Swiss-Prot record:
Keyword Cell inner membrane attached: no
EC number per UniProt: 2.3.1.-
Gene that encodes it: PMAT2
Motif stretch (DFGWG motif): 395-399
Regulation: induction: Up-regulated by high sucrose and by low phosphate stresses.
Assigned keywords, A-Z: Acyltransferase, Detoxification, Transferase
Protein name from the UniProt record: Phenolic glucoside malonyltransferase 2
One of the GO biological process terms: response to toxic substance
Top-rank lineage group of the source organism: Eukaryota
Active-site feature positions: H165 (proton acceptor), D395 (proton acceptor)
SUPFAM superfamilies: CoA-dependent acyltransferases
UniProt organism field: Arabidopsis thaliana
Length: 451
């Protein structure tokens, strides 16, 4: 695969006068944002197939519409043009927006096979990463957001986004993409009210000590303690050429059959689609890793608290509003044995129930305590994305995406999750592994559905 970068455009909001009225020069991070301060960016790729995708058509029609609509929507998403800083006299970092803020948009062209890269089978991770831009970060400043638009001549194009996780979570990112798509497709001149982001941090009420706890947790992950205010990301995992990304699918019927398996053993559980899909994917993940059955494994996911706070936050709240919850230091044998799937479903069900029944301080304290005692040798499963984000609704005027991938699941053994593109109630599950291990996961996954 050869990628040719054509230009790096600096897209500014259409009218910066909005800054003054929005009072968004400075947006402090909350304790929901702080756990992600030093994590690698969240990287996602949207693939769009085109019936007409010549260079002339792309550069004269498609690209100008994408840039113009992006400029329009940035009026309402000013923090995406900013960067994170941690001023010497401040107890925690903030997002700073300036009048010369921009979103960098890389324009590129690829000679890769579009249908293969946008498919569901095993694809080289390196080729997918090439479709996502860099997100500049240093000790003193961390860029919030960047975009890459890549043309595959006579095939289609992709939109790759890199987002700093301390700036926005998956819901905010997905809402932004869908709002941008709507403005582009309908050629709107202003943001629909139901998509307008809310920046009111005063709605989030919590003890200030939680800020300090999250900052201490983040600091504990740094090897170099000489500059405790450094915003430089934690080192990324170095992956070989044999690492692939694949998307496995659970149909609605698959979910129902798996749900019945659990009900027959534990009828009183909370068995949402998320619980079933995560439990099944996780057990396949652990079985494929194999090894010592007494080895330590931990599983983690994040709960969205927009509807769980008092008062509730608007659905369009900008930023992170998630707390990680998890089950730590279990034995791999629990998930490798015959009833491993049911065990995983029981654990995840209890964790989901606890999101509504426990105080936010208790959940945060439990996360900090559990995460602090993790060993680097522990197999640690996490979830990126959700079946509720509606990522396949992002139609810019040339049809819905044929595929959406979260490329950053290569960092930390994450499992990506999204709604199935062409079936209500189905689930797409993305995994990133060495090819030999991926083959094993796929085998466990498919055999389990047909046994």
């Amino acid at each position: 695969m050869t990628l040719h970068v054509i230009e790096t455009a600096r897209v500014t909001p259409t009218d910066y006068s909005v800054i003054n009225s929005a009072n968004l020069h400075k947006l402090p991070l909350t304790f929901f944002d702080l756990p992600w301060l030093l994590f690698q960016p969240v990287k996602r790729v949207f693939f769009y197939e085109l019936t007409e995708s010549t260079r002339d058509h792309f550069h004269s029609i498609i690209l100008p519409k994408l840039k113009d609509s992006l400029s329009l929507i940035l009026r309402n998403y000013l923090p995406l043009t900013g960067h994170i800083t941690w001023e010497p006299n401040e107890p925690k970092p903030s997002i700073i927006v300036s009048e010369n803020g921009v979103v960098l948009v890389t324009i590129a062209e690829s000679d890769a096979d579009f249908s293969h890269l946008s498919g569901y089978g095993q694809r080289p991770l390196s080729e997918l990463h090439a479709l996502v831009p860099k997100l500049p970060v240093s000790d003193d400043s961390a860029t919030a957001f960047s975009i890459q638009i890549t043309l595959f001549p006579n095939q289609g194009f992709s939109i790759g986004v890199a987002a700093h996780h301390a700036v926005l979570d998956g819901k905010t990112s997905s809402t932004f993409i869908k709002a941008w798509a709507q403005i582009c497709k309908q050629e709107l001149q202003s943001m629909p009210e139901n998509l307008t982001p809310s920046y009111d941090r005063s709605l989030i009420k919590y003890p200030t000590y939680l800020d300090e706890k999250m900052i201490e947790l983040v600091r504990s992950l740094k090897e170099d303690q000489t500059n405790i205010r450094s915003l430089t990301s934690l080192p990324s995992s170095k992956l070989g050429d044999d690492v692939v990304l694949a998307t496995l699918v659970l149909s609605r019927a698959d979910i129902e059959r798996l749900r019945e398996q659990v009900k027959n053993v534990s009828p009183s559980l909370h068995l949402s689609t998320f619980v079933i899909a995560y439990a099944y994917a996780w057990t396949c993940f652990v079985k494929a890793r194999g090894g010592n059955k007494d080895r330590s494994v931990s599983l983690l996911f994040v709960g969205d608290f927009r509807d769980r706070l008092d008062p509730k936050l608007p659905g369009t709240y900008f930023g992170n509003c998630m707390i990680p919850v998890g089950c730590y230091n279990r034995k791999a044998a629990e998930f490798m044995e015959e009833k491993g799937f049911v065990t995983a479903a029981e654990i995840i069900s209890d964790l989901v129930k606890g999101l509504s029944s426990r105080k936010i301080e208790t959940i945060a304290d439990t996360f900090v305590e559990g995460f602090s005692f993790q060993s680097w040798s522990t197999q640690f499963g996490t979830i990126a994305g959700s079946t509720r984000l509606g990522v396949y609704e992002a139609d810019f005027g040339w049809g819905r995406p044929v595929k959406v991938d979260i490329v950053s699941i290569d960092q930390g053994e994450a499992i990506a999750m999204a709604e199935r593109r062409d079936e209500s109630g189905g689930v797409e599950i993305g995994m990133c592994l060495k090819k030999t291990e991926m083959d094993s996961v796929v085998s466990f996954f498919n055999n389990g559905l047909h046994s």
